[in-house]
Curated annotation (Swiss-Prot):
EC class name: oxidoreductase
Source organism of this protein record: Thermococcus kodakarensis (strain ATCC BAA-918 / JCM 12380 / KOD1) (Pyrococcus kodakaraensis (strain KOD1))
Stated name of the protein: NAD(P)H sulfur oxidoreductase (CoA-dependent)
Binding site for FAD: A13, A14, E35, A36, H42, A43, P44, V82, D280, A298, Y422
Keyword RNA-binding in annotation: no
Cofactor: binding details: Binds 1 FAD per subunit.
Length: 442
């Protein structure tokens, strides 16, 4: 049997999932992974919790490099930056110089990078992004070596809120600045974000609809200046979004999709033969609308890698697409969604109806009940459930159940008659998700 060489660019979740899958199916093949940092199989989602101090930085690697090298037989190159890609070859800058490697199959799994605004002072000591494990190391070391009381977080998305939480938990004075009129505006409808903003305002200085003009300081950061004021800052986190790393793919002539990420089919193949893409660098299909979307979320990235590796090794498997199911929290307030928001559904041309309910997560007589708010979005024409958003307590089982229901094409009637488990320690007899379906009507 002919021995093939697979080159994977990127040693994150998608890249290592791809490499591991190929080696499982084709152990005799040569699988090389090039990772620009010294971290492999890393978990950037854990950065806020390392900064908060509840997790050691070493835990940001799911497996140490030795597992992939010795147990799985992957030729892993760390601190190895791929600087050029050609048909059949890659050029890599490693610690001992530049080298060229050949490939039969190539996988782009080189993720995404922070979108850093081009403002004065962005390079001052004490200004950080929170994108990769080295950022967590740099932030924690800065906290250890410098007096930090005032922290400014620029951004209003998931990463911004999670980083703000980390510093609130550390007892810092936190200011959260965003140019949008709402936090999480692209992901949630206003009913949800109103509750989130009330919680934020109780614990930090929330400044919306403000444009950051510059960051000031002499030897290190001292303040952040916006078009509405200035805020003291001993440390600044810039969390204003990310963009897919498509430069190498463009150089090979790979098609870039309408989202700005690499176009792939449902086998994770790109427009160039024997070239694949997976994870945050790749776009995919939305399960409801069928449109091309870019949703850089960890569960999808891992599965994309699994699919890419399977197909490279000759085991055909298809990636169906995504719903954008996601969850986060700020202190004890959980925030999550799956499927389409009302705004997204209307933009797609759906005639929708919605419901927004408040419920308890256990019977009133059983201790530990938490308040949960749910918003449901339904297609008026078919009664199909299009999306669910949640905020409050114990939201995960509701969001995950809703994701399964939406994937299966449930109507509100299907949701209402789903036989969910009940016992007082776990849920009320009328689960909030069932109540939502009842209010949405069928």
């Amino acid at each position: 049997m002919e021995r093939k060489t697979v080159v994977v660019i990127g040693g994150g979740a998608a890249g290592m999932s791809t490499a591991s899958r190929v080696k499982r199916l084709k152990p005799e093949w040569d699988v090389k992974v090039f990772e620009a940092t010294e971290w492999v199989s890393h978990a950037p989602c854990g950065i806020p919790y390392v900064v908060e101090g509840i997790s050691p930085k070493e835990k940001l690697m799911h497996y140490p490099p030795e597992v992939f090298i010795k147990k799985r037989g992957i030729d892993l190159h760390l601190k190895a930056e791929v600087i050029e890609v050609e048909q059949g070859r890659v050029r890599v800058r490693e610690e001992d110089g530049e080298k060229t490697y050949e490939w039969d199959y190539l996988v782009f799994a080189n993720g995404a990078s922070p979108q850093v605004p081009a403002i004065e002072g962005i390079d001052l000591p004490g200004v950080f992004t929170a994108d990769l494990p080295p950022d967590a190391v740099a932030i924690t070391e800065y906290l250890e070596k410098n007096p930090v009381e005032n922290v400014v977080v620029i951004g209003t998305g998931y990463i911004a809120i999670e980083m703000a939480e980390a510093f609130v938990e550390r007892g810092k004075n936190v200011t959260l600045i965003g140019r949008s009129e709402r936090v999480l505006r692209k992901t949630f409808d206003k009913e949800i974000t109103d509750i989130v903003e009330e919680k934020l305002r109780n614990h930090l200085n929330l400044r919306l609809e403000e444009v950051t003009l510059r960051i000031e300081g002499k030897e290190r950061v001292e303040r952040v200046v916006t078009d509405a004021g200035e805020y003291p800052a001993d440390l600044v986190i810039v969390a204003t979004g990310i963009k897919p790393n498509t430069e190498l793919a463009r150089g090979l002539g790979v098609r870039i999709g309408e989202t700005g990420a690499i176009w792939t089919n449902d086998r994770m193949q790109t427009s160039v033969e024997n070239v694949y893409a997976a994870g945050d660098v790749a776009e995919t299909k939305h399960l409801i609308t069928g449109r091309r979307v870019w949703m850089p979320l960890a569960p999808a990235g891992n599965k994309m890698g699994y699919v890419a590796g399977s197909n490279i090794a000759g085991k055909e498997i298809h990636f169906p697409g995504v719903l954008g199911t996601s969850i986060t929290k700020f202190l004890d307030l959980e925030i999550g969604k799956t499927g389409l928001t009302e705004a997204e559904a209307m933009k797609e041309g759906y005639d929708v109806r919605t419901a927004f309910i408040k419920a308890g997560t256990r019977p009133h007589y059983y201790p530990g009940s938490k308040t949960i708010w749910l918003k449901g979005v339904v297609d008026n024409e078919t009664n199909r459930l299009l999306g669910v958003q949640a905020v409050g307590g114990d939201i995960l089982p509701r969001i995950d159940t809703a994701a399964a229901m939406i994937t299966a094409g449930f109507t509100t009637k299907d949701v209402f008659f789903t036989d969910l488990a009940y016992a007082p320690p776990f849920a009320p007899v009328w689960d909030p998700l069932i109540v939502l379906a009842r209010v949405l009507k069928f």
